[in-house]
Amino acid sequence: MKKENEKVCQSAEALCWTEDEIKEFNRTHNSPFGEDYAQGEDNLLVSKNIFLSWNDSMARRRSDILVLGSTASGKTSCVILPNLMHASGSYVVADPSGELLKRSRAALRQKGYAIRVLDFANPAASDGYNPLLYSVDAEDTLNLTRCLLENTEPGNKVNDPFWEKSETALFNAVFAFLVRRRQGEKCTLHEAHRLVSIAAERGGEFDALFEEARKRKPNDPAVLSYDVFRLVPEKTAKAVCASAAERLAAFNGKPLEDISYCDTIALDELGDAKTALFLTGFHAAEKQKVLIPMLIAQLFNTLVYHAAFEYDEGELKEHVTLLLDEFPNIGYVPELSSRLACGTA
């Protein structure tokens, strides 16, 4: 029976609200502020009756939403898809099965969206993403290294600080070296795999490259990390290099098999015009899947920098929303909570 003050259960809040309480929430937490209804593009859809403004300072509440539920409980079809079809701002969508892309592509295009797809299951038909092109300084390369190490750890990991620091120094040296030079085809994870594969040889090409870099800039971060790696005993260094090469083995194939050979997704432009970037098929590409946490980490850094230094008001033209289905399967994103706080500030 319908009562005069029908209670509406809001599972996200674990509370039961009356209609008056819902109206009060709408007045203070979503657009248009001060009204007891929700309307406009600048709201996230939480439920049929509850919306939440992106404007955290006005709404006095963070616009980050965590949805928990068992298989087939409606997380994708009842939460992610409606927000995507709301078509407000730009989106980055984790879509492992490709279902969201199929159901929304036509509608989004009709609304003027540019569609970009990183398809791990079909690299030949995919857009490209090269994480090295979004690295600027030593902190960026360190984050790449952390993403790579954390997301390629074997299940039988043995905690050995010396080994971990040796691999970290090697990857930091190689990534920083490639980033500093940005020589087209040579600034790729494929080239990084080649360099770590030859790093164990003393006096060979690897040493020559870094000694030449030392002449140009002795305190280059790449050179400093190289010097740390060269402190590793030769026998141990060979094992470290073999392990490092295995971590990058997924990027040692042909260009058509590797979506990191080029970059066509232009992360820095996502806030300039309405764009939907889909990350799909990664359930079929376990090794190249390491690119997803790299992309998410770099997305925050890139957009925050773009907004701060390339927009007079410090805000992007288009709000960028992450809709991350099956989030636990995405992998480890370094300092995610800090990135969320900075990205929504």
Task: Identify what each model region corresponds to.
Residues 20-56:
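N-terminal pre-Walker A segment at the start of P-loop NTPase domains
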Residues 10-12, 36, 211, 274:
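N-terminal cationic amphipathic segment used for targeting or macromolecule association
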Residues 42-51, 56-345:
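P-loop NTPase motor domains
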Residues 1-32:
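N-terminal accessory nucleic-acid engagement/regulatory domains that precede
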